[in-house]
């Protein structure tokens, strides 16, 4: 049974998005009021506000995403204090990068770390990096898009940042994840016919998925031979705008190493799961390698199929979907105000586990995301048109 833990009146206008840091108990929000807020995901501390990021954008902040730790979530660099950084995408067509300076307390902590085990050191670092004493500073403003930026997303290693826009393009920016001093555009992808609503990276490889007003989802990879990025898959099946997608995480208990799976949410009221068999993709790559270069399209082409349509429950457009890395459950929400959780049975069928009606009262819900508190408890976080950020016990 879904239970409301905390409702934060975060913004004076629509809250578009709420995302957590991959390893730290930090939550960032995006709003029409042109600001982003950062909160400490600590129930014991009552989810305190750590920072208000403002005056960087002239229009709505539509999307936020924290940079993963150096080396990735599963294999972070041990001898490096990875300071948190946040990307914000705005309707003013720009992207802002925010971060903190190294805390002064770090030097005194390092002196006493020799007697502590790794877990204690990590806990100390987490407390330090999520302290209310840290000042969040604007590090960079990235320009390039012609129209509103709808979504921003870091890859799993934190060296690539993707952005998508109403201008129908996806830009991929490369940076040094240690310094974040410069962002170089290494690719502009123009495969969609209309507004690109959302982008997301695979949790453990450089595979990018985009969702669009043209009713499709497109997948992109970098060519190993010439480093060019190209479309390697097109998912057709939705009968309306695709608002959002989310990859299954390899840490999920339902994960199958032979498959890559993606869940999507659409204006057609459906939530769908797509899968790509790794062996089939490898066979295509092997065949393509034997073809003359004049007729090769790409050696990264992927075979995708629609694996399932989740039980119908939404009455209006489904705006957001999120796949839990901890339990393998999926959550969706949207225009009808419902917060829905689905689970996969042992027979590989999907069923509805719970539904919470009017999760933001009479208001639409724009995003849902699985997040982890400082005590390792998994929660759901929703952002609504009422400006509220709601935190739920699933």
UniProtKB/Swiss-Prot annotation:
One GO cellular component term:
nucleus
Biological process according to GO:
iron-sulfur cluster assembly; tRNA wobble uridine modification
Give the matching InterPro entries: CIAO1/Cia1 (IPR028608), G-protein_beta_WD-40_rep (IPR020472), WD40/YVTN_repeat-like_dom_sf (IPR015943), WD40_repeat_dom_sf (IPR036322), WD40_rpt (IPR001680)
Read off the Pfam families from this record.
WD40
Q: Which PROSITE patterns match?
A: WD_REPEATS_1 (PS00678), WD_REPEATS_2 (PS50082), WD_REPEATS_REGION (PS50294)
> Entry's SUPFAM superfamilies?
WD40 repeat-like
- The residues bearing each WD repeat, given as ranges, are 10-49, 56-108, 144-184, 191-230, 237-284, 313-352, 359-394
> What keyword terms does UniProt attach to this protein?
Cytoplasm, Nucleus, Repeat, WD repeat
Localization annotation = Cytoplasm; Nucleus
Record function comment: Essential component of the cytosolic iron-sulfur (Fe/S) protein assembly machinery. Required for the maturation of extramitochondrial Fe/S proteins.
HAMAP family, A to Z: ciao1 (MF_03037)
Q: Which family does it belong to?
A: Belongs to the WD repeat CIA1 family.
* Assembly description: Interacts with NAR1.
- Protein name stated in the entry: Probable cytosolic iron-sulfur protein assembly protein 1
Q: Which organism is it from?
A: Debaryomyces hansenii (strain ATCC 36239 / CBS 767 / BCRC 21394 / JCM 1990 / NBRC 0083 / IGC 2968) (Yeast)
């Amino acid at each position: 049974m879904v239970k409301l833990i905390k409702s934060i009146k975060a913004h004076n206008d629509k809250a578009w998005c709420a995302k957590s840091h991959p390893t730290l108990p930090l939550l960032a929000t995006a709003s029409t009021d042109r600001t982003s807020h950062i909160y400490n995901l600590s129930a014991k501390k009552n989810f305190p506000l750590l920072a208000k990021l403002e005056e960087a954008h002239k229009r709505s902040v539509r999307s936020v995403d924290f940079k993963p730790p150096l080396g990735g979530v599963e294999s972070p660099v041990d001898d490096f204090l990875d300071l948190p950084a946040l990307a914000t995408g705005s309707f003013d067509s720009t992207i802002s990068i925010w971060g903190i300076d190294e805390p002064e307390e770090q030097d005194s902590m390092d002196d006493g770390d020799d007697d502590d085990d790794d877990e204690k050191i990590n806990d100390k670092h987490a407390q330090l990096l999520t302290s209310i004493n840290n000042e969040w500073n604007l590090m960079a403003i990235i320009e390039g898009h012609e129209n509103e930026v709808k979504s921003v997303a870091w890859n799993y290693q934190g060296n690539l940042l993707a952005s998508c826009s109403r201008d129908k393009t996806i830009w991929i920016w490369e940076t040094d994840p240690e310094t974040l001093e410069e962002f170089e555009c290494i690719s502009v992808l123009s495969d969609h016919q209309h507004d690109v609503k959302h982008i997301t990276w695979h949790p453990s490889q450089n595979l990018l998925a985009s969702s669009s007003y043209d009713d499709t989802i497109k997948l992109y990879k970098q060519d190993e031979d010439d480093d060019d990025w190209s479309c390697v898959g097109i998912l057709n099946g939705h009968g309306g705008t695709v608002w959002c997608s989310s990859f299954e995480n390899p840490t999920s208990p339902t994960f199958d190493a032979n498959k890559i799976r993606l869940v999507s949410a659409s204006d057609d009221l459906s939530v769908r799961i797509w899968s790509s068999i790794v062996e089939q993709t490898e066979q295509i790559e092997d065949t393509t390698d034997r073809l003359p270069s004049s007729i090769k399209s790409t050696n990264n082409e992927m075979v995708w199929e629609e694996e399932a349509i989740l039980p119908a429950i939404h009455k209006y457009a489904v705006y957001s979907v999120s796949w839990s890395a901890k339990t393998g459950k999926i959550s969706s929400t949207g225009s009808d105000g419902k917060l829905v959780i689905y689970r996969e049975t042992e027979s590989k069928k999907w069923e509805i586990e719970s539904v919470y009606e009017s999760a933001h009262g009479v208001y639409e819900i724009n995003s849902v995301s699985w997040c982890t508190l400082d005590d390792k408890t998994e929660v759901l976080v929703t952002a609504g048109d009422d400006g509220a950020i709601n935190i739920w016990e699933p």
